[in-house]
C-alpha cells in the first residue's frame, strides 16, 4: 500500500490519509477529505 511517511502532511492524493490523529502510512477511510 502507498501512503505518506509518518509526520508528513497530506497533499490530497488518494494514497494519503489521516489515522490516529497523525498523518501516517495507511489506507484512507471513506470521506477522509471531508472529515479529516
From Swiss-Prot:
UniProt KW Secreted keyword: yes
Matches recorded under InterPro entries: Toxin_34
Coiled-coil ranges per UniProt: none
Predominant subcellular localization, coarse grouping: secreted
One cellular-component annotation, GO: extracellular region
Tissue expression summary: Expressed by the venom gland.
Keywords: Calcium channel impairing toxin, Ion channel impairing toxin, Neurotoxin, Presynaptic neurotoxin, Secreted, Toxin, Voltage-gated calcium channel impairing toxin
Role: Omega-agatoxin are antagonist of voltage-gated calcium channels. They block insect neuromuscular transmission presynaptically. This toxin is a blocker of L-type calcium channels (Cav/CACNA1).
Family to which this protein belongs: Belongs to the neurotoxin 04 (omega-agtx) family. 01 (type I omega-agtx) subfamily.
GO MF terms held by the record: calcium channel regulator activity; toxin activity
Name the record gives this protein: Omega-agatoxin-Aa1b
Annotated signal peptide: none
Localization in the cell: Secreted
Amino acid at each position: 500500500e502507498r501512503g505518506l511517511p509518518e509526520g508528513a502532511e497530506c497533499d490530497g492524493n488518494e494514497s494519503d490519509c489521516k489515522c490516529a490523529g497523525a498523518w501516517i502510512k495507511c489506507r484512507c477511510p471513506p470521506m477522509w477529505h471531508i472529515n479529516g
